[in-house]
Amino acid sequence: MINISSIKTHMFCPMKLYIQTHIDTEENNDYQLAIEIKKLKMDIQDLINKNMRKIKKEMTIAEIESELSENIDTFIESSTHAIENMDLNLDPLKINDIIDDTYFNIKITALKIKQAMNILKKDAFAITDMFFPNCMYSYLLKDSQLELIGVCDKIEIIDGKYYPVSIKSSNPPLKGVWDQDAIELVANAILVEEEFDTEVFVGFIYYEKIADKRPVVMDVNLRKGLFEVIREVKEITENNKLPNVKINSKKCINCKYKNKCIEN
């Protein structure tokens, strides 16, 4: 089966997928660390969600921020120790970035909650679903017919309809979403359709750095684009096809495969 992570890697750089598949046979912890970091971020968001239910409409923005922040530091500290004990070479700067992003997100959420409570004249508990719909996290999906498998970061369920959400820590484009993010999302959408016998018309990319959830329409062209990418991934992973790529200074400068790529 093709893992959605292979599609993501191919969309970033086909040569990176080739090297990971056929050349780099050394065991590394990068993938597991990425999973743990993403899980930590989603658990933090879930804790903010729980804290929100205690907010009253008469609270000030500062009080709302304080309430949303309850137990956040303690949770991040304990989770960080757990990850460090896994010997995954966790960079402390990565945790600092997560802390900064978390409190930035809390400030934005506090402003939105205060505005919503003022307009609706309700406590946060009564409007929680506006900000945090019923959802499932890190849901494993697969389709044996498509030979596709992956983990969807989040699936929101609103009025019986399913909305896949991909969570991104990267910088977003000025408008819309990056092509590779859209392709990953439509892959998850198709798997959601198979898993829950439903139709998915819209999904979302959540860009953490600006706390912005952007919609993506799951149209025919995007679905066709996914199948073309799947074909290209199979050419590399199954047929050992060496891809032609152009050097991109922004992508290549920090890539751990830069030297191996030049050799090939």
What are these regions, as identified by a protein language model?
Residues 1-155:
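Metal-dependent nuclease catalytic cores that hydrolyze phosphodiester bonds in DNA/RNA
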Residues 5-19, 238-264:
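Cysteine-cluster motifs in flexible loop/terminal segments that predominantly coordinate metals
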Residues 14, 24-25, 230-233, 259:
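Alpha-helix boundary/capping residues
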Residues 20-29, 193-199, 263-264:
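Short helix-capping/linker segments at secondary-structure and domain boundaries
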Residues 39-42, 49-51, 194-200, 234-237, ...:
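Short C-terminal domain-edge/linker segments immediately following a structured domain
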Residues 46-59, 218-235:
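Charged/polar, low-hydrophobicity segments characteristic of intrinsically disordered regions
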Residues 125-232:
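Mg2+/Mn2+-dependent nuclease catalytic core
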